[in-house]
A protein has these predicted regions:
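Short, flexible beta-strand-to-coil junctions
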Residues: 10-12, 224-226, 263-265
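Short, solvent-exposed amphipathic alpha-helical segments in soluble enzyme
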Residues: 20-24, 44-45, 94, 156-158, ...
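Hydrophobic side chains in well-ordered alpha-helices
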Residues: 16-17, 68, 90, 151-154, ...
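Generic C-terminus detector
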Residues: 252-294
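C-terminal accessory "lid"/substrate-recognition subdomains
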Residues: 25, 34-38, 103, 107-112, ...
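Nucleotide-state-sensitive switch-loop elements of NTP-binding domains
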Residues: 2-102, 107-112, 120
Length: 294
């Protein structure tokens, strides 16, 4: 009999994990909270302090969860994640099948957090990177308080197919697949889509990235072809005013694709990245250099 895992995430205080646990007789409620010198773990309300491994709270939680899930094989485990943890990151590191990811958010403040540049106290991430990653991983979004239409339109694009409910009506439900992001503008929320079949100029690309950091973009993702990296694609990801660009594996097809959820003008984003592409003269020069190298 396989272990069933339900993850409950969220940066806000909530009792949703307890509600899910109570609604599933025989399930086990697990929660970890990091402290300065240890990690406190609760299993069905019984607390245990665990010494930090190498001074790393996340490493300690990960290793303890591996052992716990092995010991609880065949059970339903309701995993109340530490507020700072992102469900997809936990799922990848643990290598477990998850029946449902439930994310709890403050409907009144979530969008401001998702657009902002506030930093987390505990690590190098921004608050936006945490709350956006938690929301987009959700099969079920639990809204504490009333959300305005603009927030709901953003969530429709960030987590399409996710079921929305309140803490009192929470259910464990796998979202429908495939998740198709709406492309039609709604309540001032748009989806910018940029594609190109020529590489970026590295310096101009750096300038174009600023179009994603003006406080109107909730989330962007992309796979970039840059002229000085002819064999490697770069992976782009931003949330609010936090951005990361890193190696994304072999280039494969020589194309660029960027998708951004924005409350601003999508045309300004596509225009900025269009201006960052190599011109015809630059492209001819690069091609001639490559031929000489061969």
């Amino acid at each position: 009999m396989e272990t069933v895992v339900v993850m409950v995430a969220g940066l806000v205080d909530h009792d949703v994990a307890v509600r899910v646990w109570r609604d599933r007789p025989g399930s086990v409620l697990v929660r970890h909270v990091a402290a300065e010198t240890c990690v406190r773990r609760w299993v069905d309300g019984v607390a245990t302090d665990i010494d930090l491994l190498h001074g790393c709270a996340s490493c300690t939680v990960r290793e303890d969860l591996r052992e716990l899930l092995a010991a609880l094989k065949g059970h339903t485990v309701v995993l109340h994640l530490d507020p700072l943890l992102e469900p997809d990151a936990v799922r990848r590191k643990l290598g477990v099948d998850v029946e449902c990811v439930i994310t709890v958010l403050d409907a009144a403040t979530w969008l401001d957090d998702a657009l902002g540049d506030a930093s987390m106290v505990s690590d190098q991430r921004t608050v936006a990177q945490v709350v956006v990653a938690q929301a987009e991983a959700a099969d079920v979004l639990v809204l504490q308080g009333d959300a305005d239409e603009r927030t709901l339109a953003v969530l429709d694009r960030l987590a399409p197919g996710a079921h929305r409910c309140t803490p009192e009506t929470v259910v464990v439900r796998k979202s429908t697949r495939p998740r198709l992001m709406p492309l039609t503008p709604e309540c001032g929320v748009s989806t910018a889509v940029f594609t190109a079949d020529r590489p970026f100029h590295p310096a101009r690309l750096n300038d174009a990235l600023d179009s994603l950091l003006d406080g109107t973009v909730v989330r962007s993702r992309g796979r970039l072809w840059v002229a000085d990296e002819p064999d490697v694609a770069l992976h782009l990801e931003s949330a609010g005013c936090g951005l990361h660009v890193g190696e994304g594996g072999p280039l494969g097809g020589r194309t660029t694709q960027i998708v951004a959820i924005t409350l601003g003008e999508p045309d300004s984003i596509t225009a900025a990245f269009t201006e960052a592409l190599l011109t015809d003269d630059e492209l001819s020069f690069v091609d001639s250099i490559r031929k000489l190298a061969i």
